[in-house]
Amino acid sequence: MSIMSYYARQIFDETKGYEFRKSPLKAQDLDKKIYVYSAKEDKVLIGYMKVSEILKGNTTQILKSTGYDVRPDGYEIVDYYGKDFQRCCALKLYDVTEFEEYLTLKDMRRIDPNINLPQYYSYIYENDPLYDVIREWDEAFSLDGNLCENPTKQKQAILRRGIERRRK
């Protein structure tokens, strides 16, 4: 999922418990890892999060349901969606896990030169060369207590394997 860097940082600082969208996720994606691409300034895969609930309604309802109606930054949502936007969605986030090392867009393009990271989200399937790279990256660099001993060496090895798989 692509998220502007400013909001991605808030998610991983755990000061933002909801991600607001115009379109909801599919129900099948609830409680699954959703990898976050920090767009705009950063251009990196920063970590993952899970969504436990999808709230839908107009802007006012969603702001109240999430508590953003009393937060100082609640006005940003109204500014973006409009006061009476009828199809506002809020994704309730949990298990937010940042990577020790970020996977850059430049490195992703070494694996898949045609990668397209849309504004909302895209699926990366098992037959995609990036699938195994992201899975290995997650195992090696998730800040969940399982840190690797030599991040630089591990990063190079994961990217090398990804490039080799792409060539096959």
What are these regions (language model features)?
Residues 26-37:
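Short coil-to-beta transition motif at edge beta-strands of beta-rich domains
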